[in-house]
Amino acid sequence: MSPPAAIFEPTVAPTGIKGKVVVPETATIPGDSQTKLLDHFGGKWDNFKFAPIRESQVSRAMTRRYFQDLDRYAESDVVIVGAGSCGLSTAYVLAKARPDLKIAIIEASVSPGGGAWLGGQLFSAMVMRRPAELFLNELGVPYEEDPDMPNYVVVKHASLFTSTLLSKVLSFPNVKLFNATCVEDLVTRPGPNGNAQEVQIAGVVTNWTLVTLHHDDHSCMDPNTINAPVIISTTGHDGPFGAFSAKRLVSMTTIDKLGGMRGLDMNSAEDAIVKNTREVAKGLIIGGMELSEIDGFNRMGPTFGAMVLSGVKAAEEALRVFDDRKRECAE
């Protein structure tokens, strides 16, 4: 049985650039949009021609908007590090609950989504244990359920989930995704009496991913920064960019050492990750598999329910501490 598709009304904000935002009407009847396209274009290709353009117009259209976004989000309310299934779920819940917050998502890869474009071992299907199907219902993502196997549901392709979630997140006017961008460090404020274990996180240090990958063979580049009173780190378990914030907390002595992710145990891991998603240092919330490196939880393997519900918990934590952290960062 598949849930009905949710009706989603995309919202838009003024761009600050002369012009208007157009939100096309979507087809409500299967095949309707295809029929309209074929009616418009079909059999007319010999006379087809795009509207004329000058190359500089394309350059200006891109750069004006990108640098406007850099300027707007230099002071953000929340920065989410990592646009995998956990980070995107966090962004969705936060942006929907608090449309007044400016939310920046920083993703090192060109393609957001992390490992959630496929299930385990490059297979297509995505398995989520109940009650994570409630998040699928919220998004309107169809899934299969088996009366003989009532404890989990299956999305036919992980990419269906991720593309749906990503499209909804990017439709919010208060969200900006900066992909192909790395977080190289954390912006900090001293704790009372200089206590490193009470340091406050007050933003992120960013750079182009291609620059970050070549610091060992290039003399450039100094980074950029984004200030925010709440940082949510969902960079996954240890890897080239994984567990970044967790490892940085150790190197700046805010925590003594990492707990080290344990072996795979789905039953133990998923509950632990969701329940313990929290603010691990003032202004820094860690969720998803990155948390396993802090606390020494088991890995969960190819089941994704804890990723999305850890994102829900991270959003709840951010809403709980936001006002206090914003006031403290302003002092």
Swiss-Prot record:
Keyword Transferase: yes
GO-annotated cellular components: cytosol; nucleus
Any GO molecular function: cysteine-dependent adenosine diphosphate thiazole synthase activity
Cofactor stoichiometry and binding remark: Binds 1 Fe cation per subunit.
Sites where the protein binds substrate: C86, E107, A108, G115, V183, D222, H237, M289, R299, M300, G301
Keywords linked to the UniProt accession: Cytoplasm, Iron, Metal-binding, NAD, Nucleus, Thiamine biosynthesis, Transferase
SUPFAM superfamilies: FAD/NAD(P)-binding domain
GO biological process, alphabetically ordered: mitochondrial genome maintenance; thiamine biosynthetic process; thiazole biosynthetic process
EC number: 2.4.2.60
Major subcellular location class: cytoplasm
Reactions catalysed: [ADP-thiazole synthase]-L-cysteine + glycine + NAD(+) = [ADP-thiazole synthase]-dehydroalanine + ADP-5-ethyl-4-methylthiazole-2-carboxylate + nicotinamide + 3 H2O + 2 H(+)
Subcellular location: Cytoplasm; Nucleus
Domain of life (superkingdom): Eukaryota
CC cofactor: Fe cation
UniProt function note: Involved in biosynthesis of the thiamine precursor thiazole. Catalyzes the conversion of NAD and glycine to adenosine diphosphate 5-(2-hydroxyethyl)-4-methylthiazole-2-carboxylic acid (ADT), an adenylated thiazole intermediate. The reaction includes an iron-dependent sulfide transfer from a conserved cysteine residue of the protein to a thiazole intermediate. The enzyme can only undergo a single turnover, which suggests it is a suicide enzyme. May have additional roles in adaptation to various stress conditions and in DNA damage tolerance.
Name used for this protein in its record: Thiamine thiazole synthase
Organism: Emericella nidulans (strain FGSC A4 / ATCC 38163 / CBS 112.46 / NRRL 194 / M139) (Aspergillus nidulans)
